[in-house]
Regions:
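Small/aliphatic-rich secondary-structure junction motif
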Residues: 1-47, 67, 140, 144-167
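Structural motif
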Residues: 4, 92-93
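Active-site phosphate/pyrophosphate- and oxyanion-stabilizing loops and adjacent acidic/basic residues
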Residues: 23, 56, 111
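General small-molecule cofactor/ligand-binding pocket signal
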Residues: 34-36, 70-74, 122-124
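Charged docking surfaces used in two-component/phosphorelay signaling
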Residues: 73-81
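Glycine-rich phosphate-binding loop signature in dinucleotide/nucleotide-binding domains
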Residues: 85-91
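Glycine-rich, Arg-bearing micro-motifs that act as flexible, cationic patches
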Residues: 93-116, 126-133
Length: 167
């Protein structure tokens, strides 16, 4: 399979979970991994550079030998920039974290990315910091209401098995 995985990250625990899942998918599918950090428009140069440095450290902490990994720091609205990055890279999928039902901000971002993305979207729930845990199946629906890491695309409920064993 030729292509890339776009993974939206920030400094949250849910982003670490999304990054872990994206790394696992990148290895399993042989896809290039691109971490994308989005900062607000009008961000000062110092803040932008600090975000780039933190992303570089994040990548160093989460990198695996043998996987092709890149990073981008973009300015703008997270959903807009993630969708644009996926379009620019002709991505095979986008991976984003979700803060769960109590956070409407990232929840709304993951929902907006799912609606507008040119490719499948994996929404990683809180508590998935271990990535592709062999004890968990991944499932989801278009609006991300299901538990487990989910894939959403234009049609209904999608279930996929990433080497998970059912219990």
């Amino acid at each position: 399979m030729v292509g890339s995985i776009i993974c939206g990250v920030d400094e949250s625990a849910s982003a670490r979970g999304a990054a872990a899942v994206a790394r696992g998918l990148s290895r399993k599918l042989g896809l290039r991994l691109v971490f994308v950090r989005v900062v607000d428009e009008g961000t000062s140069r110092e803040t932008f550079e600090a975000a780039a440095e933190r992303l570089e450290l994040f990548m160093t902490d989460t990198s695996d030998a043998g996987s092709s990994t890149e990073w981008l720091v973009e300015t703008g609205h997270p959903a807009d920039r993630l969708v644009a990055a996926a379009e620019d890279a002709d991505a095979s999928m986008i991976v984003v974290g979700s803060h769960g039902p109590r956070s409407s901000l990232l929840g709304s971002i993951s929902a907006e990315v799912s609606r507008r993305a040119p490719c499948p979207v994996v929404v990683v729930p809180p508590g998935a910091e271990d990535g592709l845990n062999p004890g968990r199946a991944a499932r989801g629906d278009r609006d991300g209401r299901r538990s487990g890491a989910g894939v959403s695309n234009a049609g209904g409920i999608v279930r996929f098995d990433l080497g998970a064993r059912q219990t």
